């Protein structure tokens, strides 16, 4: 009898937790209008902690990162880009609604201002339906499937990036279909989503437009080699498209060394297809112990296309960035991370609102922590 009562209680609270997730997501939209997001976020955390039981249909993690950064350009300190700064605070909510339905939600809590809507700070918010072991359908906000390993770490895990990454809004609303082979070694994904350049187009011209991106991706794991390749067609202006061919390659040399090599070619009409507008990014990582990761990275980007099609790396740009860093994980579960890195950029950036500048040095140290709430 006691076992039946216990089972009934677990089922009851499991249903309550599912209901709470739905209510929470709906209320977040309403709270955006009321401008009380932070208060509500704390409320959700307390409520989910109080109501979740042993049989949980969700997992909730809170993440935060704080840095000290010193930036200089040609030896002159950049005061706006120097000092102690909160980098990111977010929460990640994941779970299963049934054997075939799952969901995931990541919200940054430090990305809101008057020009930045609530959903701009939502990295992903999607529902996944898996009718078979091979096929999945994904609807919602999701990463834009442009390949290359540099684009794939979460923002909280990024240090110094190429100029392309800083100007590519990589989370958009859309639909995707995924096919995984029986061996589980290869996955093929087709996606249609809002163009990452829809909002930049409006900011640039003052005109609204409904623009899309069409993406095909292949990810594979074959021995010591991992692929992350894609072909992409993205609207940068109404009915005007730029094509990406992005080839991400990762090599494992034993258990302690990894090498990542990304190549991206970008081309539009009325320009040479290969080599005029491209990026090359390489990173080598080495783990001498389970608690330490040492890495070095370099990127080279050039655009000599003579067109305005590339919004991310603009015509006339030629930039190089090099750097190295170290990560230390004092805990076995790696929920606390201390990092430090140095980077140096040089070359020409024709984007007046770009990120990288000629002769820019950056020193950064910081700490990241993750707390599993549920």
Annotate each predicted stretch with a short phrase.
Residues 4-7, 12:
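Polybasic, lysine-rich low-complexity intrinsically disordered segments
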Residues 87, 121, 133, 171, ...:
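Exposed loop/turn and edge beta-strand positions of beta-sandwich/beta-sheet ligand-binding modules
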Residues 54-70, 80-197, 219-223:
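Outer membrane beta-barrel
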Residues 15, 20-55:
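Bacterial Sec-dependent N-terminal signal peptides
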Residues 162-169, 206-210, 299:
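Short, well-structured alpha-helical patches and their helix-loop capping segments
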Residues 189-240:
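Loop-centered beta-sheet repeat module
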Residues 65-79, 115, 126, 130, ...:
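Outer-membrane beta-barrel pore domains
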């Amino acid at each position: 009898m006691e076992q039946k009562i216990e089972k009934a209680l677990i089922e009851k609270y499991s249903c309550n937790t599912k209901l709470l997730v739905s209510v929470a997501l709906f209320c977040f939209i309403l709270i955006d209008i009321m401008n009380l997001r932070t208060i509500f976020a704390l409320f959700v955390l307390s409520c989910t902690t109080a109501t979740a039981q042993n049989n949980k249909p969700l997992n909730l993690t809170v993440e935060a990162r704080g840095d000290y950064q010193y930036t200089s350009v040609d030896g002159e300190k950049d005061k706006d880009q120097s000092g102690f700064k909160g980098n990111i605070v977010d929460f990640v909510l994941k779970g299963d609604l049934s054997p075939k339905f799952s969901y995931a939600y990541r919200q940054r809590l430090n990305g809101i201002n008057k020009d930045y809507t609530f959903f701009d700070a939502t990295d992903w918010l999607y529902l996944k339906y898996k009718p078979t072991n091979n096929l999945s359908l994904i609807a919602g906000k999701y990463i834009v499937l442009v390949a290359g390993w540099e684009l794939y770490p979460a923002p909280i895990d990024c240090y110094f990036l190429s100029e392309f990454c800083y100007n590519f809004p990589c989370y958009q609303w859309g639909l995707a279909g995924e096919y995984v082979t029986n061996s589980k070694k290869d996955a093929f994904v087709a996606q249609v989503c809002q163009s990452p350049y829809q909002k930049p187009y409006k900011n640039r011209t003052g005109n609204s437009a409904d623009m899309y991106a069409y993406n095909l991706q292949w990810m594979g794991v074959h021995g010591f080699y991992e692929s992350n390749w894609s072909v992409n067609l993205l609207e940068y202006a109404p009915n005007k498209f730029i094509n990406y061919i992005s080839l991400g390659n990762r090599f494992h040399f034993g258990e302690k060394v990894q090498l990542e090599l990304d190549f991206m070619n970008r081309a539009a009409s009325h320009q040479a297809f290969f080599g005029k507008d491209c990026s090359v990014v390489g990173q080598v990582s080495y783990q001498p112990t389970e608690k330490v990761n040492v890495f070095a990275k370099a990127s080279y980007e050039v655009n000599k296309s003579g067109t305005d099609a590339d919004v991310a790396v603009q015509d006339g740009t030629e930039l190089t960035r090099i750097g190295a860093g170290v990560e230390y994980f004092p805990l076995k579960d790696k929920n606390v991370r201390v990092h430090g890195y140095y980077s140096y950029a040089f070359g020409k950036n024709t984007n007046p609102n770009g990120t990288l500048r000629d002769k820019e040095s950056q020193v950064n140290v910081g700490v990241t922590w993750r707390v599993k709430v549920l």
